[in-house]
Amino acid sequence: MNIKPLGDRVVIKRVEAEETTKSGIVLPGSAKEQPQLAEVMAVGPGGVIEGKEVVMEVKVGDKVIFSKYAGTEVKFDGVEYTILKQSDILAVVE
């Protein structure tokens, strides 16, 4: 991947949502909710943002939970990614 985020931004790739419920019902694409779990694909350098030093706390390969309506969705080489600010990441899943 050749997307290089700037500042405190992070590029993530969403983890696919379940297509079948626990009771066995198959969900059509339109009924599936966008997952809030993703893998970090690229991390910006951080630095001074609006007068405050920002240290990047996530790294490539981390699994993260992020705010539901955060970021900008982009398609690159046929793959969908989301670019968001580190502050929109709520937790790292270990």
Curated annotation (Swiss-Prot):
Query: Can you say where in the cell this protein is located?
Result: Cytoplasm
Where along the sequence do coiled-coil regions lie? none
Has the keyword Transport been applied to this entry?
A: no
What are the recorded GO MF terms, alphabetically? ATP binding; metal ion binding; protein folding chaperone; protein-folding chaperone binding; unfolded protein binding
Which Gene Ontology cellular component annotation is one that this UniProt entry carries? cytoplasm
What are its GO biological-process terms?
Answer: chaperone cofactor-dependent protein refolding
Keyword Nucleotide-binding in record: no
Q: Which Pfam families match?
A: Cpn10 (PF00166)
Q: What family is this protein classified in?
A: Belongs to the GroES chaperonin family.
Summarize the subunit comment: Heptamer of 7 subunits arranged in a ring. Interacts with the chaperonin GroEL.
As for what it does, the entry says: Together with the chaperonin GroEL, plays an essential role in assisting protein folding. The GroEL-GroES system forms a nano-cage that allows encapsulation of the non-native substrate proteins and provides a physical environment optimized to promote and accelerate protein folding. GroES binds to the apical surface of the GroEL ring, thereby capping the opening of the GroEL channel.
* Identification of the protein by name: Co-chaperonin GroES
